Amino acid sequence: RKTDANLVQQDSLDTETYISSFQTSGYHRTYSESADKAVQQQLSFGGNISYRFKKLQVGFNAIQYRFSLPVIKGADPYNRYAFTGKKLNNISIDYSFTYRNLHLFGEFAGNGLHGKALINGMLLSVSALADMSLLYRYISRDYQSLNANAFTESATPKNESGLFAGISIRPVTNWQIDAYADIFHFPWLKYLVDAPSRGSDYLLQVTYKPNRQLEIYSRYKRETKISNDADDFQMISPVIASKRKNWRTQVNFKLSKHLTYRNRIELSWFTQGAGGPSRGFLVNVDLLYKPMLQP
């Protein structure tokens, strides 16, 4: 199949043509987006073998990608471990195991002799009133995968390790409390982050739903990340911490089968480095209409 990609040719005397990046947005609105349309030919083939024994399931997966044009990333330091070439192999072994109210799952993946990725998780129903989840992930800085859909903070699964823990409690009828904590680390540089970094993400939400028509929830979220200092113009910028806090309260009320009223109030605080916090708020009212489908 043909895929969208950024085509690069050095000059009119240089016949070498290569791909600097893949385009996954699917848009062809501008000249540059249209120029990226279907320039790379990709051949993908692979397979899966699964084995189930009582409550245990194990699977072996393999896939290979071949490209008509080589992929060559830019010389930026964060691209040091990026995929280059015309062929990429991915193999993995996954498992899942269920015992009563406990479910364990995970996968170990690799590409070639270097890049490795590991994920292990647990889902536990403590009682009829509480559920817990725990997930650990490790993706090496040189792991590459084109179509992975992993539980990661980054948009692409690479150069990350982290631990996620969540809990959902239903203390009384019509009330639910959800909370999670996610702590992550990036051992190598990232785009706009010129140093190894770490961060965290916390959330607490309380929901009240007395019936099918009414739902009210209040949510507090706090996130800390590292980014380059935007005011520093050195080749390798120093990094600073960015902290974002958000508090949202929302009311959803179903007026009828086709009409829903929604009201939201949201407050935000953003702090970067040693500077003072920036504040903002949002108030909006929506009236959602879902038309009746005609036969």
Task: Say what each PLM segment does.
Residues 3-35, 84-88:
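A subset of solvent-exposed loop/turn segments in beta-rich extracellular surface proteins, enriched
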Residues 35-75, 80-295:
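Exposed, low-structure sequence patches enriched in small/polar residues
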